[in-house]
């Protein structure tokens, strides 16, 4: 008499973790197999390009203040909500991140605002 899959699943469902571990070992011995996970090969070539496409969070870096430091400080204050002293310290300490872990659209907007103020900025 054949045992139905449902009967096997019901029996396994009722087992404790210790009993399941013993069952796995018995399968390994009986059939000469291993329960270790199989390593799957990644996509050939272009792996770095695929990883770059999947990036969802970006960092806007202020590289240098440029000629109009006051305008850059104002832009940094608008973007970050920092106080005057904190924004000035950030601009003086460039290169520094202005915004971190933001979506692409927000990063582009922040970079444009900084560049419009005269700063050099980049998105990482």
From Swiss-Prot:
Ribosomal protein is among the record's keywords: yes
GO molecular function, a single term: mRNA binding
InterPro entries: Ribosomal_bL12, Ribosomal_bL12_C, Ribosomal_bL12_C/ClpS-like, Ribosomal_bL12_oligo, Ribosomal_bL12_oligo_N_sf
Keywords linked to the UniProt accession: Ribonucleoprotein, Ribosomal protein
Gene Ontology biological-process annotations: translation
Any Gene Ontology CC annotation: cytosolic large ribosomal subunit
Pfam families: Ribosomal_L12, Ribosomal_L12_N
Keyword Lipid biosynthesis among record annotations: no
Entry similarity comment: Belongs to the bacterial ribosomal protein bL12 family.
UniProt function note: Forms part of the ribosomal stalk which helps the ribosome interact with GTP-bound translation factors. Is thus essential for accurate translation.
PANTHER family assigned to the protein according to its UniProt record, in alphabetical order: 39S RIBOSOMAL PROTEIN L12 (PTHR45987), LARGE RIBOSOMAL SUBUNIT PROTEIN BL12M (PTHR45987:SF4)
Quaternary structure (record): Homodimer. Part of the ribosomal stalk of the 50S ribosomal subunit. Forms a multimeric L10(L12)X complex, where L10 forms an elongated spine to which 2 to 4 L12 dimers bind in a sequential fashion. Binds GTP-bound translation factors.
Protein name per UniProt: Large ribosomal subunit protein bL12
Source organism (scientific name): Burkholderia lata (strain ATCC 17760 / DSM 23089 / LMG 22485 / NCIMB 9086 / R18194 / 383)
């Amino acid at each position: 008499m054949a045992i139905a899959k449902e009967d096997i699943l019901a029996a396994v469902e009722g087992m404790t973790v210790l009993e399941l571990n013993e069952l796995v070992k018995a399968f390994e011995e009986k059939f000469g197999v291993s329960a270790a996970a199989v390593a799957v090969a990644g996509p050939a070539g272009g792996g770095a390009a695929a990883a770059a496409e999947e990036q969802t969070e970006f960092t806007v870096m202020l590289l240098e203040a440029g000629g109009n430091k006051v305008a850059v400080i104002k832009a940094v204050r608008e973007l970050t909500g920092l106080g005057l002293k904190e924004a000035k310290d950030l601009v003086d300490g460039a290169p520094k991140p202005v915004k971190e872990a933001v979506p692409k659209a927000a990063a582009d907007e922040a970079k444009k605002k900084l560049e419009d103020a005269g700063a050099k900025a980049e998105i990482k």
